Amino acid sequence: MRFDIVTLFPDCFTSVLSSGLLGKALAKQIAQVNLVNPRDFTTDKHRKVDDEPYGGGVGMLMKPEPIFSAVESLPILERREVILMSPQGQTINQPLLRELVSNYEQLVVICGHYEGVDDRVLHLVTREVSLGDFILTGGEIPAMALINGVVRLLPGTVAKTESLTAESFEEGLLDYPQYTRPANFRGWKVPDVLLSGNHAAIAQWRYEQQIKRTSDRRPDLLEKWQQEKKQGSREQGAREAGGVGGEITTDD
């Protein structure tokens, strides 16, 4: 996977790209990150990348020319997505990360700054993506989150691939509580079931805790999960009925 990050502040990425699993993945060439500064594509002596908005308004906008020139300087791979990090975009979630991993080999990520970008930049963009319903000073932090989320799903980044499926959001529910040694810390004890060695009981406890935690913290996710589960049950029932009796008929 190739990432081309268009940013006025490439130095922001140095530590993130050299640390932890992300740094190891880049060292193993599982992914490649290329940082491009639109200021390098300005043509005036002041290297100006922003200007006042037409019609008035607060703050400055990033000019379109340096962004277009920066993006157009990049190679175009066959499966490419051009993403603008924007609070108006689709919120990053696990299904989005999996879609990007499955469908693309190159992600061009444009980081806005100031009060945003000239709207004509959207002619370059195939998708707008947001970190959430709040405003930051620029698109760099959301871009880092996007890169991290995508890279950890690439084969070879995480040693134990089963850990990618046994975590929050992968099954539509939040993760269950987890504990390590000591079994008793300041009077807070690890639940007995986790010490029992009974794998079936542990699995049941974890499932129940997932539902409880999701209900307490993200009832919206629980409702969505329940609806999807119901829909899946109906579809399975219809398939089974069709398999046993041939066509499914309804009485008016």
UniProtKB/Swiss-Prot annotation:
Positions bound to S-adenosyl-L-methionine: G112, L131, G132, D133, F134, I135, L136
GO molecular function: tRNA (guanine(37)-N1)-methyltransferase activity
Cellular component GO terms held in the UniProt record: cytosol
EC number: 2.1.1.228
Main location group: cytoplasm
Keywords tagged on the record: Cytoplasm, Methyltransferase, S-adenosyl-L-methionine, Transferase, tRNA processing
Enzyme class: transferase
Pfam families hit by this protein: tRNA_m1G_MT (PF01746)
InterPro entries, per the entry: Alpha/beta_knot_MTases (IPR029028), tRNA_m1G_MeTrfase_C_sf (IPR023148), tRNA_m1G_MeTrfase_TrmD (IPR002649), tRNA_m1G_MTases_N (IPR029026), tRNA_MeTrfase_TRMD/TRM10 (IPR016009)
Location relative to the cell: Cytoplasm
Region of interest (Disordered), ranges: 215-252
PANTHER family: TRNA (GUANINE-N(1)-)-METHYLTRANSFERASE
Subunit structure, interactors included: Homodimer.
Family of the protein in this entry: Belongs to the RNA methyltransferase TrmD family.
Role of this protein: Specifically methylates guanosine-37 in various tRNAs.
HAMAP family xref list: TrmD
Name of protein: tRNA (guanine-N(1)-)-methyltransferase
